[in-house]
Amino acid sequence: PELRSASDGDVDYSDGVFIVNEDWYGHQNSTVNFLTNQGEWIYRAFQKENPGRELGCTTQFRYNLWQPLLFCVKTGTDPGAKITGSRFAVCDASTMEVIKEFPYIATTTKTDKNGKETLISIADGRSYLPVDEHKGYIGTSNGIYVFDNDNLTIGGANQRYG
């Protein structure tokens, strides 16, 4: 199929349906396809609108009741991928262009025996629940984190329950 993009002036990503694909683990990062209301498929829309960028491995959730689009992802990179993707991505709802990417939702540092510190992820993305147009909750493998939509920041974890 012919590859088109919003920069061509004829794709409005607010007028159709997204299909979020976890993809084939061990081979590549997640992809996002788009079906226009006219029945035309736009394949790999995220990569097409953001050359050189990808979502991470096993995208779990996409939300856009209010502008912008939000993608929540389990891990940053599939073992077979060449690009480290984002774990949480904020995109323009009409153009799909990245506004902000987060390589991690939450981190800690690990120090090896030589004293070298390494930043590691402590929270794999699972879901997103909006509270209103200003705030939402990111569900992770390590608690619930607050996303500030006005400042595009991820805050600390809420107390874990259960």
What is the role of each PLM region?
Residues 1-93, 97:
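Acidic/polar, low-complexity intrinsically disordered N-terminal segments immediately downstream
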Residues 21, 125, 140:
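Short beta-strand/turn micro-motifs composed of small residues
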Residues 135-162:
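Intrinsically disordered, low-complexity linker/loop segments enriched in Gly/Pro
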Residues 41-52, 98-106, 154-162:
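Beta-propeller fold detector
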Residues 73-127:
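Surface-exposed, polar helix/loop patches in the mature regions of secreted/periplasmic/lumenal proteins
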